[in-house]
Curated annotation (Swiss-Prot):
Naturally occurring in which organism (per UniProt): Tetrahymena pyriformis
Function per UniProt: Specific for the oxidation of the 20-alpha hydroxy group of 17-alpha-hydroxyprogesterone and 17-alpha-hydroxypregnenolone.
UniProt EC number: 1.1.1.149
Protein name: 20-alpha-hydroxysteroid dehydrogenase
Catalytic activity, reaction form: (17R,20S)-17,20-dihydroxypregn-4-en-3-one + NADP(+) = 17alpha-hydroxyprogesterone + NADPH + H(+); (17R,20S)-17,20-dihydroxypregn-4-en-3-one + NAD(+) = 17alpha-hydroxyprogesterone + NADH + H(+)
Length: 18
């Protein structure tokens, strides 16, 4: 399942797993 994690610069980083 893909999720997006908000980074400090305001962008979203996609992660896979969990």
């Amino acid at each position: 399942l893909a999720k997006t994690v908000p980074l400090n610069d305001g962008t979203n980083f996609p992660i896979f797993g969990g």
